[in-house]
Amino acid sequence: MSLTSTESKQLVGRYLQALSGQSKTPELVDHFVSDAGLAAHIRDVEAAFPEYELIAETLIAEGDLVAMHGAFHGVHRGPFAGIAPTGRSVSAPLMIIYRIANERIAEHWLHFDGTALVTQLQQ
């Protein structure tokens, strides 16, 4: 049975809350995510910015899609984009569209200001 738009939005809200500010263990990620690309992305970002946060400013749902507008916050503690750890706190705006299937995130499309993040790391 597929989720309603409201239920899909609630699922993404729970996902963001569960993963933000703590270690993203495989068990935790697998609970919410069936998209292998997103799971790999989470692992890569977690390695560079342990316990990073995704803060949703807006969540909009329609059908099986949920759009999130918000911000990434983290502390640079591992290599990222060829940059050695700096210990700097960084933030950058982002937008993600999630497709929900079988009560999990099945696909995602990420729009992220990587230039803003790299600029903060190089200052």
Which residues make up each language-model segment?
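C-terminal and inter-domain tail/linker signature
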Residues: 1-123
